């Protein structure tokens, strides 16, 4: 497990030391050649605190300034999220920010792409199974006796079922896993578990695929990825793959008490979005 950063918000604090050799090599590569480094970050739980209503999620107040200070000093910064790209841009407040002129947001696990240069979103047609599940899901949840407080989030190219508002969120979550997996399979989709949420989406869409393609497009010589949830595990696997190909990488976990799997895989663990902000600020200061 990675070590935690301190509680100080002083951007001149020394960088924390990753707990693994591979992580230390990844950080050293970033610092040695920042102009060849790609930094990828999740949105919810990483740049934005987790809230009960995803529509109310917003980037940490200091996240965008920290990104804007760091982005001009590295090859590229990409936000990789399960949200629609345009929604992440709005909730993050990323558009029109000095320092983020070349930011990329890969939405729907890379199926959508927003570039700050153009300010537009590009995307292929949606999978037909998503529309079928969207129509069937309300009645399906009623028939299987889903817990009261379970609710559906429309995500455009995916549909998510949340249990955070249920009386027992974890029990409601576990009760839905098998039925939703069956529903997803019937329509050619898969289920991605998260923090009290199960997302039904097309196969072949994950943060690992998105990160690999973006790193290769950028010709990066090192990669850092920051995430908080089970949906970030494919991105962690992608960094492992890049490491095996000779590209140094650093895995950072935005730690929480809800999800421990990422912390166990990470080179470095920070204290939620606030800790992510501190890390970004410190990196920017180190690269001055």
Q: What is the role of each PLM region?
A:
Residues 1-43, 47-52, 62-65, 69, ...:
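Non-catalytic pre-domain segments flanking phosphatase-related domains
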Residues 11-20, 34, 60, 208-288:
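Mg2+-dependent phosphoryl-transfer enzymes with acidic/Ser/Thr/Gly-rich catalytic loops
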Residues 38, 76-78, 104, 224, ...:
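A structural signal for isolated positions on well-ordered beta-strands in alpha/beta enzyme cores
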Residues 41, 107, 227-228:
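Active-site flanking residues adjacent to catalytic metal/cofactor-binding acidic residues
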Residues 46, 85, 231:
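Conserved Rossmann-like nucleotide-cofactor binding loop
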Residues 58-154:
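Active-site phosphate-binding/coordination module
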Residues 96-112, 182, 262-277:
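Structural recognition of alpha->loop->beta junctions
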Residues 147-238, 247:
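Conserved acidic, metal-coordinating active-site core of Asp-based
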């Amino acid at each position: 497990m990675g070590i935690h950063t301190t509680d100080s918000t002083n951007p001149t604090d020394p960088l924390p030391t990753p707990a693994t050799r591979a992580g230390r090599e990844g950080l050293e590569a970033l610092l040695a050649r920042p102009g060849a480094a790609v930094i990828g970050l999740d949105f919810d739980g990483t740049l934005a605190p987790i809230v009960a209503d995803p529509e109310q999620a917003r980037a940490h107040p200091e996240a965008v300034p920290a990104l804007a200070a760091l982005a001009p000093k590295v090859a590229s910064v990409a936000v990789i999220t399960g949200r629609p790209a345009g929604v992440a841009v709005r909730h993050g407040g990323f558009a029109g920010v000095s320092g983020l002129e070349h930011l990329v947001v890969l939405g729907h696990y890379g199926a959508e792409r927003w570039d700050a240069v153009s300010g537009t979103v590009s995307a292929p047609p949606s999978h037909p199974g998503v529309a079928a599940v969207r129509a069937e899901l309300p009645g399906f949840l009623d028939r299987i006796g889903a817990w009261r407080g379970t609710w559906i989030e429309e995500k455009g190219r995916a549909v998510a079922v949340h249990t955070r508002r249920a009386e027992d969120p974890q029990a409601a979550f576990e009760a839905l896993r098998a039925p939703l997996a069956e529903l997803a399979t019937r329509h050619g989709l898969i289920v991605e578990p998260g923090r009290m949420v199960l997302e039904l989406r097309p196969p072949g869409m994950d943060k690992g695929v998105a990160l690999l393609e973006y790193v290769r497009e950028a010709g990066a010589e090192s990669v850092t990825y920051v995430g908080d949830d089970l949906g970030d595990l494919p991105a962690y696997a992608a960094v492992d793959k890049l490491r095996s190909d000779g590209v140094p990488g650093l895995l950072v976990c935005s730690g929480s008490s809800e999800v421990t799997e990422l912390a166990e895989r990470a080179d470095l663990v920070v204290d939620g979005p606030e800790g992510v902000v501190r890390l970004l600020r410190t990196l920017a200061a180190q690269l001055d």
